[in-house]
Each structure stands twice: as structure tokens, then as C-alpha cells.
């Protein structure tokens, strides 16, 4: 055994390594050296500054935070489990290598914020939005409490941190949802801040440590199999703190965005289409039934944005939206006629089962499918003037064989999202799909076609228990 490696492991473990520990951990010596040489006094100072700036309401003394930090950096001395040692080394390495650049930088002097004059007060749109939502408010409220509704008391503090994070890291992190609309219209209320970024895992691990060192409480990262590249941070009561989708840099580049107060938000035009698409998901309609007023102000703001940005006239005149579609129950495929618009495809096959789409793309021997990850929740392939794509939401039926207009419109919105992401033609169909929302009669739901069931195990990162499962 190499004496230098043995000495490093001995100093790190606080004891002489066993033969098994030596051979299992010798590949980690560089990381271990990085951990041991890490200046913990400077790190403790950064944590204190983060606490003072973002978590000032939480009662924890500097000595308590120092103790939490030093205890964690000696945690490897209290276990002989190789699996736990690997987890500790991996998490400590992430912490010492990335914390300063990811969260520590938030305490330094901020760059000048160029205030935005983009503000929308959608008075004229509120009545239109209210009438639209009244028409599609057709779901029966269930008693089930969704995880996103069970929020932690830490959300307010994390939101304060996230506002600064979004400004400092606006090349790699973008927001959408209620907070992004709040930036357009301050009368909108928001809960947690919805984000997409190119380094979600690193960010959430660092945030988990920051919360642990300040509060002394454990937080857990959870990766769910049915959402691509998604991780959620939960507190020790299993309440939601924040979640984040990870996207590739090329996907981030493709997302249409606007800059407000040094923060990039997903272009509200794209968010409007996403909202229309999500109304096909039955639990989102249940949210609408619980609180229509909350959705009204959001929709009104989005409608006002597209009215001003694209000059859309709201008169209810439309001839081709939702685009004509039919549903094959056995194959779970929707066929959409897109021929009346200036698209590069005349027809679209919309699959409700992602594996079936992947199989058919393979059979087509086509290798130019485009994957926009969670931005669209689907790949897109155009082959022989036919688009192939996947729809991840439930499908509502208005009769045994007829797709409910809410879902037909949601599928049409999904197709228009592709047009925007690929810089295709979308203004005329955008005007049509928005006007198709107006002057409608409420149609009850006849049945619900369930969405694709994803299989797989949850991934967990538990700092307290030294567990990392991918």
C-alpha cells in the first residue's frame, strides 16, 4: 500500500484505513485532499453572510452554524460503511468545489439592475379571461392534496435567495410560472419560484447544505421517474421547498425568453400556450375549480401580453382552432390535421405513450428527432411531411369518440410550442387558438383518457443518512 495514500486516508478517516477501505477509497484521494485543504473558516463566513441576507428570520447563532458545518466535515470519521463513505465524499466534494460560485457569490456586491418598464395591468382582459375560465371550469374537485400544495415555511426565505440567484446566474437559470408573471404584473401572487437551469443537481445540493447548516434540520432531494430531469427539495416534514428542471445548454438557448430586472423569464407567449396545453391535465382543471380567481389574473396578464406584443385582436373569429383531430383508442394516438397552416408538415401523430413513439421513430430509421426535454415534454420528428410527437397530459373526451375541445386545443398548443421553439410560423395560428377560447359553451367531461404511466424508482439524496440513489 502506498504510504502517501494511506496517510491521506488516515487523516481523513481519523483512523488507520482497513485494507478494504484503502483499495475502495484510493481512487478518491484527490477529492479527499481537496476536502481536507478546503478553508472551512472562509466557508463558515460565507454561510453566515447567506444567513444574514436571506434567512435572517431564522433563529440560529453563529456558533451553532459553525458546529453544524464542522460536524459534517468530520462525519466520515463516524462510519465504516463504504457506501456511506462514497456518498459523504461525493457530497463534500460538490460542496467544496462549487458552493462559492453557486451560492457564495450571492453575498458579494450585486451588479447594477437595469429596471424594466415592462408592466402589464390587464384590466381589459380580466372579463375575457374570466369568461374563458368559466367555460373550461368543468372538473370535479378531488380531495387529493398534490405535493406542490404542501409547502414548507422555508419557501419565503428560499424565494428571497432565488430572486438574487436568477439575476446572478441568468445565463444558466430561467424562471416561469407565477413569479415570472408577477414581474410583469405585481398584483399576481406567487408561491415558490419555478425554474429551469443547466446545473439543477449542483444547485439543489448546495441549497440543501445551506439550509442544513443554518437550521440544523435535514432536507432531502427527490428525483421522480415520471418527470424528466426533475428534482425537488423537501424539508424534514416532507414539505415542498423548491423544485427545478435541468436542461441542456442547447435547450436553454432554444427557449424564448425576455429580460426583466436582470432576470430572464420564459416568453409569456410560450407560457400562454403551455397554460392552454396544461388545461388538458385533469388535476390542473381541479386547481382551477378550487381557485378560479387566481387563474383569471394569470390568464388575463398573458392575454394582455400577446395582445400588445403580437397585435392580436380578440373577437372570437376563428375557423381552424382547435385543429381537426381524431383519436384511435386502441393505439392511443391522436391524428391532427395541420394542413391549413404554413407548417413544414401537413399532419401530426400525437402519441399518448412515449415508448410507442420511440419505437415508431426507430422503425422510421430517422435520426433527426429534436428533444426539448421538459420544455415540451416530448421529442419531435418530422418525416415525410408528418410530425411525430408525444403528449404527456390526460386527454378529456366530450363523448365516446370525440376529443373534448379543451384537450384538442391543448394538443394544438403543443404543436404551436414546437413552431416557436424552432422559429417556425406561428402568429396566425396563435391568433386563432387564442380566439378559439372565446364565446364558448361549457361542455361536460364524458371520460378521461389517462396519461402515460411512467415506471422507475425515485432517486434520493439524503445528507443526514448519507444516501445517494440515482
UniProtKB/Swiss-Prot annotation:
Keyword annotations of the record: ATP-binding, mRNA processing, Nucleotide-binding, Transcription, Transferase
GO biological process, one term: mRNA processing
Top-level EC class: transferase
Active site (catalytic residues): 192, 194
CDD domains hit by this protein: polyA_pol_Pox
Signal peptide from the UniProt entry: none
EC number: 2.7.7.19
InterPro entries (UniProt xref): PolyA_pol_cat_Poxvir (IPR004976), PolyA_pol_cat_sf (IPR037265), PolyA_pol_nucTrfase_Poxvir (IPR024231), PolyA_pol_nucTrfase_sf_Poxvir (IPR038419), Poxvirus_polyA_pol_cat_C (IPR024397), Poxvirus_polyA_pol_cat_N (IPR024398), Poxvirus_polyA_pol_cat_N_sf (IPR038337)
GO molecular function: ATP binding; poly(A) RNA polymerase activity
Chemical reaction(s) catalysed: RNA(n) + ATP = RNA(n)-3'-adenine ribonucleotide + diphosphate
Similarity remark: Belongs to the poxviridae poly(A) polymerase catalytic subunit family.
Subunit-structure text: Heterodimer of a large (catalytic) subunit and a small (regulatory) subunit.
Function of the protein: Polymerase that creates the 3'-poly(A) tail of mRNA's.
Protein name: Poly(A) polymerase catalytic subunit
Lineage: Viruses, Varidnaviria, Bamfordvirae, Nucleocytoviricota, Pokkesviricetes
Amino acid at each position: 500500500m502506498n504510504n502517501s495514500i494511506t496517510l491521506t486516508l488516515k487523516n481523513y478517516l481519523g483512523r488507520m484505513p482497513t485494507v478494504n477501505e484503502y483499495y475502495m477509497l484510493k481512487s478518491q484521494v484527490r477529492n479527499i485532499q481537496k476536502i481536507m485543504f478546503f478553508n472551512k473558516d472562509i466557508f463558515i463566513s460565507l454561510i453566515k453572510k447567506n444567513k444574514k441576507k436571506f434567512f435572517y428570520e431564522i433563529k440560529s447563532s453563529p456558533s451553532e452554524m459553525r458546529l453544524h458545518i464542522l460536524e459534517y466535515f468530520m462525519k466520515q470519521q463516524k462510519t465504516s460503511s463504504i457506501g456511506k463513505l462514497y456518498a459523504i465524499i461525493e457530497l463534500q466534494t460538490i460542496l467544496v468545489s462549487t458552493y462559492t460560485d453557486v451560492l457564495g457569490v450571492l453575498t458579494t456586491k450585486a451588479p447594477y439592475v437595469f429596471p424594466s418598464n415592462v408592466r402589464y395591468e390587464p384590466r381589459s382582459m380580466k372579463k375575457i379571461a374570466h369568461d374563458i375560465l368559466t367555460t373550461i371550469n368543468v372538473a370535479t374537485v378531488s380531495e387529493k392534496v398534490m405535493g406542490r400544495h404542501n409547502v414548507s415555511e422555508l419557501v419565503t426565505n428560499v424565494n428571497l435567495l432565488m430572486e438574487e440567484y436568477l439575476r446572478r446566474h441568468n445565463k444558466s437559470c430561467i424562471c416561469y410560472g407565477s413569479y415570472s408573471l408577477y414581474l410583469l404584473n405585481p398584483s399576481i401572487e406567487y408561491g415558490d419560484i419555478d425554474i429551469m437551469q443547466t446545473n439543477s443537481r449542483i444547485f439543489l445540493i448546495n441549497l440543501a447544505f445551506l439550509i442544513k447548516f443554518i437550521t440544523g434540520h435535514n432536507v432531502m432531494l427527490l428525483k421522480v421517474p415520471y418527470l424528466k430531469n426533475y428534482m425537488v427539495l423537501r424539508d424534514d416534514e416532507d414539505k415542498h421547498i423548491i423544485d427545478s428542471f435541468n436542461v441542456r445548454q442547447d435547450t436553454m438557448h432554444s427557449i424564448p425568453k425576455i429580460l426583466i430586472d436582470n432576470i430572464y423569464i420564459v416568453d409569456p407567449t410560450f407560457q400562454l400556450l403551455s397554460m392552454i396545453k396544461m388545461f388538458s391535465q385533469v388535476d390542473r382543471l381541479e386547481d382551477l375549480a378550487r381557485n378560479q380567481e387566481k387563474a383569471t389574473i394569470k390568464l388575463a396578464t398573458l392575454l394582455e401580453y400577446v395582445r400588445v406584443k403580437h397585435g392580436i385582436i380578440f373577437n372570437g373569429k376563428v375557423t381552424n382552432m382547435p385543429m381537426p383531430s381524431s383519436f384511435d383508442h386502441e393505439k392511443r394516438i391522436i391524428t391532427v390535421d395541420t394542413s391549413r397552416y404554413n407548417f413544414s408538415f401537413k399532419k401530426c401523430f400525437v402519441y399518448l405513450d412515449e415508448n410507442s413513439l420511440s419505437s415508431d421513430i426507430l422503425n422510421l430509421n430517422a435520426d433527426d428527432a429534436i428533444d426539448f426535454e421538459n420544455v415540451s415534454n416530448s421529442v419531435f420528428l418530422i418525416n415525410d411531411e408528418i410530425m411525430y410527437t408525444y403528449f404527456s397530459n390526460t386527454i378529456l373526451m366530450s363523448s365516446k369518440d370525440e376529443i373534448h375541445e379543451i384537450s384538442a386545443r391543448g394538443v394544438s398548443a403543443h404543436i404551436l410550442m414546437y413552431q416557436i421553439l424552432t422559429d417556425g410560423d406561428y402568429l396566425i395560428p396563435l391568433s386563432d387558438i387564442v380566439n378559439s377560447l372565446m364565446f364558448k359553451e361549457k361542455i361536460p367531461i364524458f371520460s378521461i383518457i389517462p396519461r402515460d404511466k411512467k415506471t422507475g424508482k425515485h432517486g434520493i439524496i439524503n445528507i443526514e443518512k448519507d444516501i445517494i440513489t440515482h
